[in-house]
């Protein structure tokens, strides 16, 4: 992962994260981890599963509303918010040494293979 001292112009906080034309899932995982790091965002650093539980539910409901409305632009945004919540909760457990995003993906794939 390449990092830069310049943050994106519109950032409310200065991130040491490279601004790019487009990002992928690995960037998303790295960014969430960075935000929780000592050099990241003070708010993100202190969050727990319990403190952001409501956010997870709210983002899920907002994704459902976008699906119900057939609004693909809003749906893409809200699915990103749900994914951010998954990554955030996973990063808390990665820090604790319990599991990481690859473990979550492994368990999900195994479940799908078993069910199908």
Per-region residue spans from a language model:
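Flexible "arm" and connector segments at domain edges
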Residues: 1-79, 84-115
């Amino acid at each position: 992962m390449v990092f830069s001292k310049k943050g994106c112009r519109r950032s409310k906080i200065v991130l040491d994260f490279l601004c790019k034309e487009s990002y992928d899932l690995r960037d998303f995982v790295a960014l969430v981890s960075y935000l929780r790091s000592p050099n990241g965002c003070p708010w993100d650093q202190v969050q727990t599963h319990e403190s952001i539980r409501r956010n997870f539910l709210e983002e899920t409901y907002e994704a459902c509303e976008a699906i119900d409305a057939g609004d693909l632009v809003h749906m893409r945004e809200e699915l990103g918010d749900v994914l951010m919540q998954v990554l955030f909760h996973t990063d808390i457990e990665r820090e604790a040494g319990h599991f990481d995003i690859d473990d979550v993906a492994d368990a999900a794939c195994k479940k799908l293979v078993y069910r199908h």
